[in-house]
């Protein structure tokens, strides 16, 4: 079934430097140039949803926002000031900024979802264990389909939380993320158990 994304992990060994250069040259730069030719210059975050196939890179979609859940592990690794970056983008002065600083460690994000997602699901379930999950070393819990009702965090959507962790390796980041996932409970909570496995084989 088609979901909004159930996990993410950067950097991935599945994408080489050559592949990144090719994506920039064949997808991103032509897109920006075409927008300018159409007199629709773009300032902001342009997220390209791509699929790597045997025939090369295929564009699935563009979004004028960060990807979800791709943003969560990227923000865990970003050491530069995000506000400075966004303001420089809006003011068209990106070239004035120094190179971005990144934590060299990989990050893994695991999306916790409501039972039934991506089909029909129920909401309003109390979420427990958030403090315990946040206490896991190098882990953070990003909220998506949640709300605060009478002092209790409850589910309000299909994709509920993005549990994300840094690690010394992809395997270690996965271990930390799933350690935090195991702390969190609500009726019908589920997640994939194989996020980042393709990068470890």
Residue ranges of model-derived segments:
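Internal nucleotide-binding/catalytic subdomain
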Residues: 1-71
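Gly/Ser/Thr-rich active-site loops/lids in small-molecule metabolic enzymes
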Residues: 12-24, 68-88, 125-141, 183-185
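Generic structural signal for well-ordered, non-membrane alpha-helical segments
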Residues: 16, 20, 24, 28, ...
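Short alpha-helical interface elements
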Residues: 31, 52, 56, 60, ...
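Structural beta-strand/beta-sheet cores of well-ordered domains, especially the beta-sheet scaffolds
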Residues: 43-48, 55-62, 73, 82, ...
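Glycine-rich phosphate/pyrophosphate-binding beta-alpha loops
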Residues: 63-75, 116-118, 147-149
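Peripheral (often C-terminal) accessory segments that flank ATP-dependent C-N-forming ligase machineries
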Residues: 88-201
């Amino acid at each position: 079934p088609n979901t909004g994304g159930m996990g993410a992990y950067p950097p991935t060994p599945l994408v080489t430097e050559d592949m990144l250069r090719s994506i920039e040259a064949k997808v991103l730069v032509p897109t920006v140039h075409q927008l300018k030719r159409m007199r629709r210059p773009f300032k902001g975050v342009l997220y390209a949803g791509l699929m790597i196939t045997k025939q090369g890179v295929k564009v699935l979609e563009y979004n004028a926002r960060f990807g979800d859940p791709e943003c969560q592990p990227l923000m865990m690794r970003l050491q530069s000031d995000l506000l400075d970056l966004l303001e420089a983008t809006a003011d068209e002065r990106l070239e004035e900024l120094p190179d971005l600083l990144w934590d060299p460690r990989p990050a893994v994000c695991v999306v916790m979802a409501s039972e039934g997602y991506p089909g029909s699901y129920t909401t309003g379930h109390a979420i427990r264990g958030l403090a315990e999950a946040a206490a896991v070393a190098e882990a953070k819990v990003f909220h998506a389909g949640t709300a605060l009702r009478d002092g209790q965090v409850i589910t309000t959507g299909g994709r509920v939380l993005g549990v994300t962790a840094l690690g010394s390796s992809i395997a270690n980041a996965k271990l930390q993320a799933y350690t935090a996932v195991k702390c969190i409970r609500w009726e019908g909570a589920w997640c994939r158990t194989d996020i980042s496995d393709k990068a470890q084989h």
